[in-house]
Amino acid sequence: MRVSAIMKTHSVPHDCGFRTILSLATPHHMLCDHVDISQAFVQGDFLPGDGYNGKVYISPPPGFREDQGYVYLLSRPLYGIPSPARAWHTTMSAYLKSKGCAHVGFERSMWCVTIKRHTILIASHIDDFMLACADRAMLDTFRQGLLARFDGTYEGEVHTYLGCEIERDMGAGRTLLSQRHFAEDVLRIFAMWDCTPAIRKRCSMLTWDIFPNIMLGKKSHF
C-alpha cells in the first residue's frame, strides 16, 4: 500500500514563525511557557484510512512469543507505522480547534486564540509546545487544560526551542536568541574546540574602494 507524504509527515513551525511569536511576545510583555507532551504519538487517534477498515494489525515484535496464526491489533498509533506523526497532529489540532484556536497564516502548527481579551499564541514542534500570553492566570488555565487532555509535563519558562537558546529581559523588553551551544557541541564532537583559528591572509590588491564601482557597473582593476 502506497502512503502519501502528507500522511507520514507532521507539520512543524518554521523558524520564522517561531521568531515571530517571540518578536510579538517581547514588546507586549508576554510570558512564554514550555510544555513537553510525553509519548506524543501514542496519544494520537488513528486516521480513518489507516490499516484495514480502520484497524491496524502487526506481527509480534522480535523476541516476543509468537503464537502461530495470531497477529496483534494496535490500540494506539506507534512509531514505525506510516502515519503516527500525522495522526498525532490531527488529534492535537482537533483539541486546539475545540478551544477556539485558529491557525496563523500558512503555518499548520501555530495557532492563536483570544479569551477574555487576552491573546494566547501557540507553537507546536511535535511534542514541544510554546505558549505565550501576557496574563499569567490565563496562561496557566490554558496550559492546565492542555495537560489535562494530553499527558505531559510543564517545563517552566521557555529557555530553548527549535535549537535556539532564549534569553529574555522582561524589564528591558529584550529577547536574545543564540545557537552558541549548538556550535560548541559540534566543535567538541569533532575535537576542534581547542583548535587555533586559521589566520586568513588579506589580499592587499583587493581594497574596499572598488566595491562602489562594482555596484555601479564601472570597471575596476585588480
Predicted regions and their residues:
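Long, low-complexity, charge-biased intrinsically disordered regions
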Residues: 1-222
